[in-house]
């Protein structure tokens, strides 16, 4: 398991809406790439509705950058479950979990079908669009013989 983050933390200020309500604040936080990579692994593995909600926004607004993909690869190879079990996991039924634990948590209403589509889009973006050198590296790690000079920004 990975202890820490792939990228350095960054300083962030609160949004204007939070500042208006609570006042100014600035804090050191995990990088966007590390946060998003963790959300992606969570969405693929645990399939938490919050992660699908966030991934939906990520894909619509920022996409999968090289920095994010590198962090994702680092998190995948340090994950406690086999990569194949995470990357090829069948989507569980989200309707019951949505009604029980997600409805009312967000200002924006997103139905189950949209979150299921986020899963499909995520698999296409993270796995389908993965560069060949990244694929070869993941396969070599899975075989227990890491090869290549894939720079993960560590």
Predicted regions and their residues:
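Structured mid-to-C-terminal alpha-helical surface segments
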Residues: 1-154
